Amino acid sequence: MLVYVRGAGDIATGVAARLVRAGVSVVMADIAVPTCIRRTISFCEAIRLGEVEVEGIRARLAQTPAEALQITQTGDVAVVVDPQAKMLDELKPAAVVDAILAKRNLGTTRDMAPAVIAVGPGFTAPVDCDAVVETMRGHFLGRVITQGSPQPNTGVPGIIAGYGRERVIHSPAAGVFWSDRAIGDIVSAGDVIGYAGDTPMCTQIDGCLRGLLANGVQVTEGFKCADVDPRGDASYINYISDKATSVGGGVLEALAMLTDVFRG
């Protein structure tokens, strides 16, 4: 079975990892210049680097649908630049998963594939998808919804070790992002972690820099550029998060509900 995942950031990567480990072939699509910050555990880095490995699963960049299918036949994840999902006609996946996490629907419709699964707010099942998976941290994280919508976006990041909004760093100005920091660095409150042009941006808390935008990305004021983990454990940068794993499990459950992937 082939599944086409829209988005290839950290949550989408958690989805893809669970699918691949369950024996499902995966093609992931993202924009030409991805803007994810948790790059050490995001398959979209294959667009920038050519290939990347996360938790033992390799993802490789493909230029065409045919090349993408060849890559999936090796057991690897294929990553394509296809923000408008134009490759669907050639790929003919059994299911489409929208894991862009844009907090709104960027064009996913129920007729894209026999099964269409969405992730996070901005979708209503069964209106624009067959099922949608909850992404808000808390009691309902990872649950499959077949009638209705997930909880609305609050604009406040999930709480980790007592910190929510403080752990995410947004650009104070428009400009080209650059940093001499690296994901995994231990930082202290007040440290400069990067710049938008000549304007510095600082962390508000102590912790481990677990997310950092790639250098050279054009940002607007308020753009999410970095994420500090207050737990301070640098090893976490190498592992898919608890949230992404839970959401991935929900997508896998929805896929089993909507298709015959696990039926003899």
Indicate residue ranges for each PLM-predicted region.
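Well-ordered secondary-structure scaffolds
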Residues: 1-264
